[in-house]
């Protein structure tokens, strides 16, 4: 078995692919354009370079600045040994680091699992176990809850989990790392992974169901069609300002038209 064949098997394990006739129709109609989410934001950063992408408290990030941080975080992840197809659980509040972590992980072919701030041990440990996630990114504290305690429980019980990356104070717990100084990686870049827009980009979570949320695989192609169409329907443009109140990792907050739709239009 070739290395590429083995990688494809890993990437599609447990995933039901779109029927080929559907794929051909979506491509023919222009719904799917073969763009990855990573390349999507790179294009946004080129098109709207000096526009303000995010205001996070007192911090303002232009599109080009946000892309710079994404590139730097991708280098950091690569230097930690993460590879194409590795899973990462991201559980962060509505802060800039969420987008840096999300797009940085996608940049090297990792697959984020979009955990919400309200999730606790039962949910997070399930996400880690189901995907064999190697990395868990969380805040130190948010809304009175200490995520480091949750992370420690997961680290002790989930064999696949290699690292906990904390935005804030990591508490000097063994196996925990504080969010890196990204300026150390300014002059470095990663080699883009050998992935197509038809591959699974990340996993979102089912809503309204009973029990533990189910993982929903989203491909680059299918997700970006929703983003582009929603941005047009909502008539977003470069003058649009969006106050993000709902959890940023939620599907509605990301793509309906959400933050990604806003990026597509060049808004803030």
Regions found by a protein language model. Give the residues of each.
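Conserved pre-ATP/AMP-binding loop-to-beta segment of ANL
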Residues: 49, 183-207, 212, 217-221, ...
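Conserved AMP-binding/adenylation subdomain of ANL enzymes
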Residues: 224-241, 251-268
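Structural core segment of the AMP-binding/adenylate-forming
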Residues: 1-8, 110-180
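Conserved AMP-binding/adenylate-forming core of the ANL superfamily
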Residues: 31-42, 50-95, 99-103, 120-125, ...
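Flexible, non-catalytic linker and terminal segments flanking ANL/adenylate-forming cores
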Residues: 1-34
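Flexible, low-complexity linker/hinge segments
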Residues: 25-35, 173-200
